Amino acid sequence: MTAKRVDMAAPDNLLFLDSDAVNSSPASVPIEQNEPTHVLDNQTDDSLRSMPDPHTNTALESTGLMPVPCQDETLETHSQHNEGENESSLVSTQHMDHTRLTEMTINDEKSNNWDFDISGVKENDNSTNLNPDLIHHAGTDSVMERNLNDKQTDLNHKDETFGSLMSSEVLLLKENRQQEMSQDTNLHQCSSSESTGIEYSQTANDAISDAMNSEQSPDQPFSIASNDTDKTTSECSVQTCWDTVESAATSKTQPELHDDVKDVMCESFTTSQTLNIDYLSTDISVCLADLPETDSLNILTPASTLLGILGKNNNVLKTADVPINDSEMVQSINKDLASPNADISKTVFTQMDQNLLHVTDHNVKVLESNRADTVVDQYVFSENIGQEVSQASSHDEDLNSSVQSHDQQLSTANSEIEETSSEFHTQTCQDIHEGVIIAEEAMNGHNTLPEMHDIADVTTSQTPIMKDPMIDEPSYLPDLHKADTPNVITTASTLSDTLETDDSIFETADVSVSDCELIQTVTLKTVTTYETLLMMHDVGEDLTCCDFTTSAIEEPETSHPLSLDDLHESNTPNIPPHASALLDSLGMNKNFLETADVPVSDCEVIQTVTFETVTTYETFPVMHDIAEDLTCCDFTTSETPKIEEPETSHSLSLDDLNEANTPNILPHASALLESLGMNNNFLEAADMPVSDREIIHPVNKDLDSSSVEICTVVLTQTDPKEVQDSDLDEKETESNRIDDSIDGMIDTKFSLDVSKLQPVCSNDLSGTVIHSESLFSQSIPDTPQIGEKYKNDLLQVISPPTPVTNEDLGNCSEEIDDACLKFTGTERDVEGDSELWLEPSQFLAGEEDEGAIFDKWGRSCSSSPPTTHPDNTKASDYTWRENISIDHNAEDWELTFPPVERWSSSDSWASALSDWFQAVNTYPEDSFKSASTGSKLGMAIQDNILEQRTSSDNANNDEQTCLSLNLMQPDEPGQALERGLVKSDNTNGTVFKQGDKERLASCLDMDKDTTTMESQMSLLETSTPESHKADNNAVMETFNASLTHEFNAKLHGSLDISGKLLSAKREGNVLVEVTGGKVSQLGLVFEEERQSIFTSPSSSAYTRDKNLTGCVSNEERCHSSDVHLCICPSQSDSHVSSKAGHAEGNGSFLHSNIGNCTVKPYVEENIPQFIMPFAPICTGNTFLHRSFLKEDRSQADLDLPDKKIINKINLKSNKKSSSSDDSSEDNFHTCPDQSLSSSSGDSDDPSITDSGRKPAYSDTCDIGKELSKLLLLTGEHFMVSEDKRIAYVTLDLDESQHFGRFSLPNCEKQSKPDNMPHKTSKTSSDGKMRSKHKEKPDDKQQHGIQASKKQDPQPQSQVKNEGAGCEDCPVAVIETIVITEKIIPKTQGKKKKKHVQHGTPKPENDAPTDVRSESRQKNVNGKAENLELKVASNSLNKPVAQPSGKTDITKKDSAQKVMSVRPKVEPSMAKMDPAGVNATQKSSPIKLKADTFNTAKMENKTCTTDSLSTCLPSMLNDDIKRRRIADDLSRAVPIRTRPQLPAIFRQARKDGEDVTRRAYSEVVKQKNSTPKEVVVPRVVSEIQADPVPADPQNISLWCQFSPIPPEATIKWTKEAAVLSEINKVEKEDGRFTLTIIKACSKDLGFYKCSLIVANISVSTSEYHLTSEVLMELVIPSHDQPAEPRVMEGDEENIQCSPLLFKEDFLSDQYFGKNQPASILTEKVHFGEGMHRKAFRTTLTEGNLPRFRPGHPCVLKVHNSISYGTKNNEELVQKNYSLAVEECHVQNTAREYIKAYNSVAKSAESFGDLPEIIPIYLVHRPSNDIPYATLEEELLGDFVKYSVKDGKEINLMRRDSEAGQKCCAFQHWVYTQTEGNLLVTDMQGVGMKLTDVGIATCKKGYKGFRGNCATSFIDQFKALHQCNRYCELLGLVSLQPKPKRTVAPPKPKTQPVPKKKTFGPVLNAKS
């Protein structure tokens, strides 16, 4: 063989080699002559080594070529047979590759799998020095002959494929090229990478070896091709390059190759420069049968690979933390690509010897031309993996024989093609070099691999971003169920279903990227793991992000390989930090989040993608906010923009939902919502940044496409078999599903914790009562069930529902085809839903027969007809919010949670006065935004059956949906009682069409004679005045028309239900009346039970008797001025329908047989919106109906709202009847023995005017004798009975209450003159008798009212305007009836008069005498008086009415100026006497302690401490005793002295309003007195805190009074300590300021400013200066942190680990990644505990989630004491255990308080929420005590709110809001954990808590053990006393209820012996 030296000065520095050099190139180790030249199937290369070989290879020398090392680390291969250097000898220059080369090994003789070790191929950037990676093939004689036939087929196929591309001249060289391909298969470097699955027969290899040996003759010259072949060869080369690309792109088995060849770059050449390749489509579609065997994708970084391409699922390639180049990647991939099923021959492509290609321009051109075809053909074969070689060993002889002639032709190439051929082959060479990588990456391709062409673009920023390929939708959904479709989205890529799509593998550049980018890449790639692949536990093994490494985390290991069956059943992802997920995507749909247009940082992608894409399971719970508190690169998840209304890309029908699960991955609210039969096990994130409505809304939208017109999403936790049937074509199935879904009407905006939802009925139409019972008892696991004792009673009223006929359902669908009732509520519903609800049937043992226990509202404990009588019910009546009235006020529904049964002793009431002022206080400006305008009507529903959902954001609601309910009589078993849940929505709900209203009558037209319908109910339809539409958008629109099956067959008898559905149309925000027959309105009227079985008088607003109240004809109603619903008891066989004001859309409507119902005029009602119960006012309903108190229960009438307060009822009408026109707003009604029907005006008139209507008033006048003993003696607001241990409280809010709005039923109307409001009718049978006692009520109240009427000559319309101005003010009024109707024995009254006369000197100016005289005269006439019905018609902010004509006319001007102490607060119910201290001053609420004392002084009397008994004769009787009146009377401080006194204690005593009853003679003496004008200042501005501009360290507290009388004194106090006192203040503006110098934590507390002048003292409310306010005023005033600490200490490097939680935070806890930081710690600790010391420290470096450099922190070092001979290792372990335990305890308590806060948010007026700060585990490697905890430093007064026994131990903080909320939190946790876990040691600064402890039961709680003794739980249970926050949360008292016996109807009540209920804890307060 000859070789000539080429000219090295050629531009390309290339070598042209003859064909003999193919076998002798240094790039491929020559084959030993004494060994066979064929390769074993199972062994490829065992002797790889880098160049140059240190040993001389004799075989290499035999070839005539010698490798010569050069100084530039290159090798020049010289031919040893050269005659001269300048001749045509061969010199090959190549780069020396020192990297480890590919090692190809065979696993065993029996396997066909090729196994490749990882090796690196160093890529050379020099275009002239391409690295030839040597592969030494050890010849063997084994199994190559087994695929002889396959090889022949492959060769034939190759011939057919590429023969057409060549000219006739080139065809002559075909056999030569084939032979060379066979040689190249064995010789070239990368044969290992492409030889997978290819087997060569020994015969073929022998033939090839012979051919190679024959070509090594040194004397054989090159053959030179003629010029005729130049053009043909060039075209052939181009065409062959195109074939190369095309074959790679159209591979049948590797469809992903089509994108790889687009950007192929080989040195300076890219494929795009040669061909403009578009995305080529694969011509095959993978069948589904291939999927289970081939889907096994494992994407690793920075290079990608597929593991186990054909079912191989246990060979996970672990990623190294070093970037590798493409060659290494290629070889790494190959080792896992061996497959036992790879029986098709994959042509082995090897990197050809570079010497074959590098031919200079001066060499033979024919060689280049023909060699190009060979090379490109080989390239084609390397890329065309799927093609089969058609010709194998049968052509070997022809190949061998034609080699020499072929080489001769190549040596004669013409120079005309030199340039073109040279350039082309350079490019081809480069393509081949890159083609190796492409070919190997092509092996990664799956036939079902999703498109992942550019996932790495976010990490390898230096790599050009490729455009997203267009993705086609799958042909049909069933494919999705069987095909795995993970969809991993990055900022510039999308994965799609791979069925019939052109998928491409992303190209990974070998660019060294940062750790953050690498982490991000891992995150984005690992989520594509397929079902058959093991969990990728080690993807982020050694990554580092933002100074945080993952290497410190131990490598988690999967427990076992999951089979397909396991994945389908368990779907358990293994989520390591920062990389993560096993995505079982079976059944996934292609609805995925696309974040392409969201420019986010890498860390955002890490947190959003990593933690949310793992949720795309078909059965795995939602994990929408796993990364809630993680921070990376100064980015926290909470900073991510909230997505308001995420939308899915398309809507799904219910059929689709059944077959294909649809995960919708949102950035912060992702959910897998398969609504039919899905596994409802959701992960609830405590700090969910968005509301659940944003999660649910997309599903609602998707469900719109369903063929079901009404929402059929069944979210109740029932048997999935009952609801999963999605065959919508079957009518019966659809009907049943509709029944279930509508019965389950559940707010789809609350969190999908379906375990708390309650099913309403069962699909089992043939179910029995037992089935219903089991349904209720088993399907509501989180709701306490009724006691065993009363289950039988409950079963009597439960029966299986009546099925809906197909006709009925069809009618429904036809009529409301566009109506899709979405039951979406508000955020508060979400939060309120998780509250704890206890049923009223729970009672304490031994108290069954002790008599009824009444709640704080003075009612029987059961307000609805219970299955057991309320006398035995020992819990409050607010069970699950079921009995909330139909129009339950939206804003105060939280306040109707189960009141705590707190029957405090006198000691506790003493503490209530002193301790609860701030806690209970509520002002109208703090109250709810909208006023209630509806009447409260009770529902005759079983407490344990009906559950009513209320919406809190009703001011914004404009849709209401109401369920219909049937009520059976309690004693009749088998009657169906359906449970209705009402939801409101302000979004997209639709209502029934107007035309549907006409079907109400037919729908409800039942047999009037049906006797089984004993619990008949009217249908109440409400409307809202136009003046309140803005606040009452949430009016109930209609009851749910779809539940036609609720008309039980038993109920209807033989009636035929027409199936026509009730419908109503909204006009504005008001529900119009329902037309059709007489059934025009919805209403609920029930009759009180006729007889009481137990001893206590029942005041339940629900009927217990099966007889309903009678119907009052419409004509009768139209002639009555009493607008309230009053029923004639004698007409018990008919129905009453009333239209009453409806609060904002809450409650349930009940409809029934109302065929004869009459129309009741609309009644609008303003309900006081807040009441804080302290003690019962009476034993029964607060509305003291006379008939309730009589033994004849048949006369009982119950039509009052179930609100337990006096109701304001506004008549909604402009049309007044004659009686209404004649009536005044002071009409009173006495109640003898007859009911009064009431109606005035036309109910159809939806408008309401203030001046145009005159509401009527009614009141009760008859009090039962036995009940009168429990009423207040006087008008005092709070009295305590020492003997009975009962505190009597009258509630108000210092707000004006137009009492005309209230009416009491069963009263006979008595109209009176306008100016005589106190007169009542003489016709009352009991009124005359009662009036004798009532003539001696609190004279000051009479006086005030009379004077008010006298000085009110304005017309009635004006008076009405005054009252109307207050109707938006929520006021709770209970005192009126209680005060005025108390029976006072004459002797006692005389005694009081005597005390008054003797103890009170006669005043000089007896101003009120004349007024009192009139009051007395009017009382003598025997009129029952209601002194305060017209009281408080004016607001404190408004000028008072004109003074009486008998008062000094000069006082009118001051009347217009004087205002109340608190302008923002409406006046209390009792007005001050205008004849007292200035008759026009109706303002100053006087302090409770001294109100009577000041009242006497205002009447120019003197009342000292010594004469207190004479001033309070009525209070010091043996039965009732005022508490804490004698304290500090000399100061005469008004009510504002107390810290935020509760509303119930702020009822003001009006001027001259005496607390005692005065004798008639005294009144006469005072008649002619003229009042003395006294200027009373008022508080213009309450205390406010402002910074001092001059000195940011100072703050100023200021307030303002007006007017400022002369000789006034200003006194500033802090918690009773006088800070400043200024005498004789003279200021025009009335503003007074207190400056606090250098304000610090010591200045925190309650501040108050008082203005004292003469006998008047006016004070502001106590202002609480908290640490939050202090920090806001002082610290932010500086540019730098206030007083930066100059800390001297040691700086050390630490690693912090946060404690993370999974779904169950009690059992699934783990520490996150270590985050490096540096801290500077003081040397001396500032605090010390049992096992730890606290050091102040400052973070100097590092970004922790809650800290930044410079942030003050506290380092707590747990130093365990060394006992005995413990070694250092044991101490370190103990130190670690203590630190870890504290992290677990406090962070677990933090999770509990998060849940507590979510519940507390739903309680209006709850206020600020407490927080437990997180702590972190700190590792200090350089310290002897290596482990500690780190937490935020709390600045301020550190207070222990409660300790382990649950008591509040800090007396200075006895009324602390934080302290009470902490105790309520302890109570809440105790209840939630059923007494098994208690959070103790509640302490901290303000609302931020730390150092908490947890006590658990002995065995722990759910695997969690606390750090406190179990005895703490028992102590808490015994000592905890509920506060107002416990009540707001509906928590039941832990104390045993006191056994009090309510007096039966006896002449005298026997006092109950004293019993200290709560132990000695309050002894100090007594």
Swiss-Prot record:
Disulfide bonds join 1599-1649. One of its GO terms (biological process) is epicardium morphogenesis. The keyword Membrane applies. Residues 211-227 have a biased composition (Polar residues). It catalyses: L-seryl-[protein] + ATP = O-phospho-L-seryl-[protein] + ADP + H(+); L-threonyl-[protein] + ATP = O-phospho-L-threonyl-[protein] + ADP + H(+). Residues 1325-1342, 1401-1417 have a biased composition (Basic and acidic residues). Protein kinase that recognizes phosphorylation sites in which the surrounding peptides have an alpha-helical conformation. Regulates cardiac development and cardiomyocyte differentiation by negatively regulating Wnt/beta-catenin signaling. This is Alpha-protein kinase 2. It comes from Danio rerio (Zebrafish).
